[in-house]
């Protein structure tokens, strides 16, 4: 069973390593959430992770199994139309431990914290639109397509697309 706690600065390297191994490169192919065929490079850096941990309007939740960080999610408080919502991102589970329910319980734990601490009225996230398996996974957790899309962000210092025309699709869950 996973135990959860909010990340601290001491966790920065472990978080960046886990997120990058789950999203990109050959190690990510051990799981079902890989972006290795879509993007080269890194998903995040230790600097980005540290800045998220330091924010008052965000937290990174860690899933720990047998004293090892195996899952992570970033939750940011935002205001949309005058209402508190939470944006979920950087959701990662160690590739060799995916498909065991850890991702679902991680998301539910982050949602519970955001509901309790921020009194949010909903959640949203962005996924690469051609990742139908991810959209289906999030749909099983109550997230629905919003019909909103945006171009995939350019960050040539970190990642390079392997395919053209990537975009992000927004999903939302109303409480």
Residues of each region from the PLM?
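Extreme N-terminal starter segment of soluble prokaryotic enzymes
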Residues: 1-4
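Acetyl-CoA-dependent GNAT
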Residues: 6-12, 16-96, 107-109, 113, ...
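Residues that form or flank phosphate/diphosphate-binding pockets in enzymes
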Residues: 83, 101, 133
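Active-site acidic-Proline motif in GNAT/NAT acetyltransferases
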Residues: 94-100, 129-130
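Short glycine-rich hinge loops at helix-strand junctions in the catalytic core
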Residues: 101, 118, 142
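Residues forming the Rossmann-fold NAD(P)(H) cofactor-binding site
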Residues: 104
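C-terminal "cap" of GNAT-fold acetyltransferases
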Residues: 121-136, 140-175
